[in-house]
Amino acid sequence: MADIQIVKRDGRRQSYDNKKVAAVVARAAAGFELDVSPLLDAVNNYVKEGIGSQEVMNFLILTALNLTSVENPDWKNVAGRLKLFDLYKKTALARNCNHCYDRLYDYPVFLQQMWADGCYDREWQAKYSAEELAEAGTFIKPAYDLVYDYAGINLLIKRYLCE
């Protein structure tokens, strides 16, 4: 594949890396018995000079949905995971930590940011100790996110995240 430049969400240009896309697709398809080559072939044929990385992700999600069938229902789960990864990326960017996906569920750090941004009332700081807030963070199980299929994650985003 010739060197194709894509536009990242922050406006930077970068060479399209089909191995990086394949790794994302493999992570989304983990645990399912699916041949991911139709999805990878489709996206590699779709990518063109100057395309945005968000458009590439949208194409991956829609193509995974289109691959869903009676014979291959797990593609709806792959589409859901891809949508979830997109949400993680948007969340990381909104929190000014482009590559901090491992910290998205760091509840005390999240609360500090929400207090600093004025989104949450600082009254919580007086009512709960740092240890209690850290304990509350342990109740969140990121692995449960991977259970959502496309319809589930889409509903969650539209209903509860006001997208």
Give short role names for the model-derived ranges.
Residues 1-163:
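Extended catalytic cores of very large enzyme megasubunits
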